Amino acid sequence: MRCTRWTVLFLGTVALTGCESGGRTGVKGTVTYAGQPLAVGTITFVPTGEKGIKCGGRIENGQYQIEPPFGPMPGPHRVEIRWTKPTGKKYKNEFGEVFDVTREGLPDKHHKQSTLTATIHAGMNVLDFNLEK
């Protein structure tokens, strides 16, 4: 019986430890391009300070949300936003499956050469990005 109590205590401690976010925060918001919600894309937060790891999430219907276990650490970040736009062409792979050919739909200034920045604070952050052409 005593072994069972220790086992339960140990497993409970392990479970609670696994729930910590490790200092990571949550972030959510909206992304628009030329005044319209970005239909589908990705957003990435790249730390510019001394600590943190690059993280990101999906944009759907102009909205994104990254929960604390997967979000950025507090501090300054460079923000990269991407959107793949269909070109109107199709591609057929060796299995006969047909796919849309896509290209990057946003100017480099919003991803590769991004000058977008954000300061992340502890807790849930709300950050909206209104991108221009």
Label the predicted regions.
Residues 2-133:
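Glycine/proline-rich low-complexity segments that form flexible loops, beta-turns, and polyproline
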